[in-house]
Amino acid sequence: QMCIRDRPLMIKEHQRFLEEIISRGYASEISLRYNSNGVLLTEKMIELWTQFKQVKFNVSIDADTVRNYYIRYPTNWNDVMQVLHRLDNTPDNISTSIEVAVQALNAEHLPDFAKFVLSQNFKKINKQYLAEYQAGGGIFSMHLLFIPTFLSARILPQADKERIRSKFMEFKQW
């Protein structure tokens, strides 16, 4: 398995690397895993991925619309949505997960983001993760941001943490 991070879709050599693996006949034995915001995803890359045993594409999104633009400047929300809908319609060997870095800038709004994701009625995004792990998947996957410390949710005042907790409890009942 190959885990590919740090802007793999920006690197021209990456596509050539995948083409070389395919030409040598190894692709059907190799699983790939990507972490990316996905905005540079091309049809050519998806075409190459169909040759591989499995591709897990983790899309880094931390909020919806304007909040995502603020956190992941200069992300264009329309581009993000286009990528998500394209990934939701890929062959079965390609699975997709929305990955959220929980932080001070988005923690309070994650229940709203979850409602937004659910409203999209994705057919396959995060579905494989739900089946594999029996928990955590289904809407999006989360991990905590610790560095830089000034963005960590741990810096929030206790009153803010309680308000956020209440929003999550309300969402749980939703």
Regions found by a protein language model. Name each.
Residues 1, 17-18, 22-23, 28, ...:
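Eukaryote-biased activation of long, low-complexity terminal tails and linkers
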Residues 1, 5-12, 24-43, 50-82, ...:
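Core AdoMet radical
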Residues 13-19, 43-49, 109-111:
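Distinct, well-ordered alpha-helical segments
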Residues 17, 80-83, 113:
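Alpha-helical packing segments of well-folded alpha/beta enzyme cores
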Residues 21, 84-87, 91, 117:
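Hydrophobic positions in alpha-helices of CheY-like receiver
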Residues 47-54, 88-91, 121:
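Acidic (Asp/Glu)-rich catalytic clusters
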Residues 104-121:
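Catalytic cores of alpha/beta
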Residues 119-174:
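C-terminal accessory regions of radical SAM enzymes
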